[in-house]
Amino acid sequence: MGIFQRLMKNKELIPLAFFISAAATGASSFALYALKKTDVVIDRKRNPEPWETVDPTQPQKLLTINQEWKPVEELQRVRRATR
């Protein structure tokens, strides 16, 4: 007996199947979204410090209000001196 036949036979299972499917889809979507973020390090051998290559002018959040980025001159001098 297939899953659709079982759902049509027991109609009370339809909402349960819907909510379980929606929860699984949401969890999978969030996991993929979280793995694409720049603060997640999966391979430390090839790129040990991925946060150094993040573009500061590009917002990292879903919603950013009035973000302006200006480089801190002292920090830039320290970065150039340590390289």
From Swiss-Prot:
Location of this chain's protein in the cell: Nucleus
Keyword Signal appears in the UniProt entry: no
InterPro entries hit by this protein: B12D
Principal location: nucleus
Top-level taxon: Eukaryota
Keywords from the UniProt entry: Nucleus
GO cellular component: nucleus; respiratory chain complex IV
Pfam families cross-referenced by the UniProt entry: B12D
Keyword presence, DNA repair: no
An annotated GO BP: response to bacterium
Family: Belongs to the complex I NDUFA4 subunit family.
Record PANTHER family: NADH-UBIQUINONE OXIDOREDUCTASE MLRQ SUBUNIT (PTHR14256), NORMAL MUCOSA OF ESOPHAGUS-SPECIFIC GENE 1 PROTEIN (PTHR14256:SF3)
Protein name according to UniProt: Normal mucosa of esophagus-specific gene 1 protein
Designated gene of the protein: Nmes1
